[in-house]
């Protein structure tokens, strides 16, 4: 999209825009972004530029409030996990995946009910993403996207633990769908590095061997060199 000199760039996909023309505007530096949604825009811009460059995506701009940075990343993870949930619907059915499980040792109870109970995996996935969206859009806990109270930031860890179960179920029970989506988005890889960087989950709960595979591939590459 070439704009005349001095003309403001409309950073929005107009109705009727073709898929190949989505986001067809020049990148901005973070300092040039003057919207209250600047952090979200910056994260999404880096993902579009190269979703495999996880270190770049997770590196905050200088002086960025850490609570807001974690919050905006978690919102983005939930947005992208909806894409995985849509793909899972093709084979993750209530009569075949009757429980939200990962390995045989893990059965997860759904917190969307008054008393947590077992749900079919696809229902658990929907309930969990809906619950995360409700919390992250709550005016009570997150009235501002510019500054966030520490007591609200503390709630992000529980959201991380719950949405991670979507990755783990997909990995252990729908591996082809998981691999295809991961190869497109690097989403589980990015999420794993994110929660480790900010200590939002215990390493013992990170049961999808994403980083182990990375280390093995690195060692294999060095051996072949």
Curated annotation (Swiss-Prot):
Q: Which positions bind Zn(2+) 2?
A: 110, 113, 119, 127
Q: What is this protein called?
A: MOB-like protein phocein
Q: Which InterPro entries does the annotation name?
A: MOB_kinase_act_fam, MOB_kinase_act_sf
- Entry's localization field: Cytoplasm, Perinuclear region; Membrane; Golgi apparatus, Golgi stack membrane
Q: Which organism is it from?
A: Homo sapiens (Human)
- In which broad location class does this protein mainly occur, judging by the first location in its UniProt entry? cytoplasm
The family database entries (Gene3D superfamilies) matched by this protein are listed as: MOB kinase activator
Q: Which domain of life is it from?
A: Eukaryota
Query: What does the sequence similarity comment in the record state about its family?
Result: Belongs to the MOB1/phocein family.
């Amino acid at each position: 999209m070439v704009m005349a000199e001095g003309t403001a760039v409309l950073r929005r996909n107009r109705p009727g825009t073709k898929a190949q023309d989505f986001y067809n505007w020049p990148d901005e530096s973070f300092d040039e972004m003057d919207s209250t949604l600047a952090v979200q825009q910056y994260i999404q811009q880096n993902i579009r530029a190269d979703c495999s460059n996880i270190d770049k995506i997770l590196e905050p701009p200088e002086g960025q409030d850490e609570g807001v940075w974690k919050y905006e990343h978690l919102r983005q993870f939930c947005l992208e996990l909806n894409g995985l949930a849509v793909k899972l619907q093709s084979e993750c059915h209530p009569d075949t995946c009757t429980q939200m499980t990962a390995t045989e040792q893990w059965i997860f109870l759904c917190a969307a009910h008054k008393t947590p109970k077992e749900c079919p995996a696809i229902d658990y996935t929907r309930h969990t993403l809906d619950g995360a969206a409700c919390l992250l859009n709550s005016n009570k806990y997150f009235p501002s996207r510019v500054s966030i109270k520490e007591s609200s930031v503390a709630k992000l860890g529980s959201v991380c633990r719950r949405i991670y179960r979507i990755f783990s179920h997909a990995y252990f029970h729908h591996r082809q769908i998981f691999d295809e989506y991961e190869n497109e988005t690097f989403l589980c890889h990015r999420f794993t590095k994110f929660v480790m960087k900010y200590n939002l989950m215990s390493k013992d709960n990170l049961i999808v061997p994403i980083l182990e595979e990375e280390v093995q591939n690195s060692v294999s590459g060095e051996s072949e060199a």
